[in-house]
Amino acid sequence: MAVLDVLIYPDENLAKVCQPVETVDAELNTFIDNMFDTMYEHEGIGLAAPQVNVLKRVITIDIEGDKTNQIVLINPEILESSGETGIEEGCLSIPGCRALVPRKEKLTVKALNREGQTFTLEADGLLAICIQHEIDHLNGVLFVDHISQLKRQRIKEKMLKLKKQIERAK
């Protein structure tokens, strides 16, 4: 397996809407394995394909981080949502920054699994928040799009400095 490069905000591909997956095959499953490897390497609990520069509707999640409850959502769609909640969210594409984001407390999601079969998942708490965060990525939305323009600009400046440091280190 491989650890993939994670795009850093404000990379323009993070703002693009992803295309649905047409075929679930061995190549996609290898990519999903690489997404999990990348997510664990960066100590994340969720990762969306556009974060690794693949504009497809694929999400990997493991809120426990122990590799026993891995969730794959291909072409996810929120069917129902209720309640209000929110936590300070972070993002692998915006390292070191967090912000309070309003989210729905409970969700029902329909998606394809790794075998290409349709399933529904009921989620609440942190899992529901994570699913919403990752689906936002598929729609070209980042958590900074939910906060004030001033805070967003400060984070953007911080990330541009970080990107320059990373480039110099290569």
UniProtKB/Swiss-Prot annotation:
Pfam families given in the database record: Pep_deformylase
Active-site residue list: E134
Cofactors that this protein relies on: Fe(2+)
A biological-process GO annotation: co-translational protein modification
Keywords, ordered alphabetically: Hydrolase, Iron, Metal-binding, Protein biosynthesis
Broad EC category: hydrolase
SUPFAM superfamilies for this protein: Peptide deformylase
A GO MF label: metal ion binding
Cofactor binding, note field: Binds 1 Fe(2+) ion.
Catalytic activity, EC: 3.5.1.88
Binding sites annotated in the UniProt record for Fe cation: C91, H133, H137
Catalysed reaction equations from the record: N-terminal N-formyl-L-methionyl-[peptide] + H2O = N-terminal L-methionyl-[peptide] + formate
The keyword Iron is annotated on this UniProt entry: yes
CDD domains per UniProt: Pep_deformylase
UniProt keyword annotation of Transport present: no
Function description: Removes the formyl group from the N-terminal Met of newly synthesized proteins. Requires at least a dipeptide for an efficient rate of reaction. N-terminal L-methionine is a prerequisite for activity but the enzyme has broad specificity at other positions.
Protein family (similarity comment): Belongs to the polypeptide deformylase family.
Protein's name according to its UniProt entry: Peptide deformylase
Source organism per UniProt: Glaesserella parasuis serovar 5 (strain SH0165)
Gene designation: def
